[in-house]
Amino acid sequence: MMKRVELLSPAGDMERLELAVKFGADAVYVGGTQFGMRSNPSNFDPAQLQAACKLVHAAGKKLYLTCNTLPRSYELDALPDFLRSARAAGVDAFIIADMGVLAIAKQAAPEVEVHISTQAGIVNYAAANAFYQMGAKRIVTARELSLDEIKMIRDHTPPELEIEAFVHGAMCMSFSGRCILSDYMVGRDANRGDCAQPCRWKYHLMEETRPGQYFPINQEENGTYIFNSKDLCMIEHIPELVAAGADSFKIEGRAKSAYYTAVVTHAYRQAMDAYFAHPSPDFRVPDWVLAEMEKMSHRVYTTGFNFGPLQNGQELNTGGYVRNWDVCALYRDQQGNRLIVDQRNRFFEGDVLEVLEPGQKPYTLTVRDLVREADGTRTEAANKATEVYSFAVDRPVSPDAILRRKRDED
């Protein structure tokens, strides 16, 4: 029987954590109030972390805590208590990049698994084995590795050492995320969780002896995004990832929206389940699952370094996202043939909305008999942000349903 591969999803707050679990994650990774590589998301204070662990464990899933900054010496005094608090909350593993943090974790909370972060830059089996000897249960391979190189690590490490590989999300233009642009340009240290993402900004090229003369890099007069990476997407390559020996498929995006978390988790869950039900090197992702990859905010996709040196990993024309779909509403209640929803973006009488439910292929509903619940009046438009509306439906709708609409093409 083929081993089960874990699907690991990000969660920036409790709402995203709940959606990740409902839409199919086997495990989630979150950040605490300190020592995590994302300082901007809501993150989890000790009480929230305890509640998150309880929710995740009740669903039979796991929760991993990021402790993957590169802390300075003056920050270390707070680390043991932080780790002990996380252990008491019930986290299943710490994600760690720094060897000093690893040593402190083994002293402060020795029973908690340690996963070595991609920030550690593991690119060979000698490094993987060294971390295993230090007590690591899992390594997260550097994004710069090919699948052949991951397979080489798998072949030269103990089977007890798990291998986690990124399969989806944003990629850093610096090696394994070790960037100093943000610190240099705006004083925000990317290696301590505060990246301003200057790689996404627009740049011109100037030769130092010709100040004021800006040279074209691309056929655009407005500059070019020369540092800007595309987004990783490996959903069509599950057989290759499994053959390389990955034990866990990791999705990037703790700072992404709740909708993103739900859609990307659901898509990979459905693709993985379809593959493991009938494993074959010729496996093809169901068309409707593949279509989901275009229904969330993303940059142009790439397979990154997985198949060798990166040739077309930059997106030179824009630092922004492709956004073709809007979340219109979330399920609130259903009373008979009336679906009651919380509005998120405007929609109108007669609109055809697509409904995404956990474990199901999306289906459509037509908005009929639209009513504003606050006063019970009929309306042609649900255009008041966060208000409650209802409309007629002819089928039951899941309490976890997300209702969305494709943006009009102007």
Q: Positions of the model-derived regions?
A:
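Alpha-helix capping/helix-boundary segments
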Residues: G100-V101
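Glycine-rich, positively charged N-terminal anion/phosphate-binding segment
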Residues: R38-L55
